[in-house]
């Protein structure tokens, strides 16, 4: 789990796909606040990620918890695009087969631009950031 988590972070931060991260026939089910998309290959999953997050970013916080068939991966990420800093928080349910990711179900908060982050910071004090 830890090795796959590290490989996944590398992919999320750089867009580079470490060897052995995804099965060629990996299934993606991505849910965003107002949309849902799916992909049925590593090539399509990678294209979907790069379309939504084309540049490098940083995973600023993450956690992985094992399940009987894989693990749950929670993370926060930040990146710069369109002249501003963006933020998203996501939860992934990952199914692993033969040491590689076979299925990835993603729930995303959506991409928060600078204005949304400022609005949230002014309105809400998080107990556990």
List the model feature ranges, each with a label.
Residues 1-25:
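Short acidic-aromatic low-complexity motifs
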Residues 17-68:
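A solvent-exposed, acidic/Ser-Thr-rich amphipathic alpha-helical stretch
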Residues 6-9, 18-19, 43-47, 121-124:
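Generic detector of well-ordered alpha-helical segments enriched in charged/polar residues
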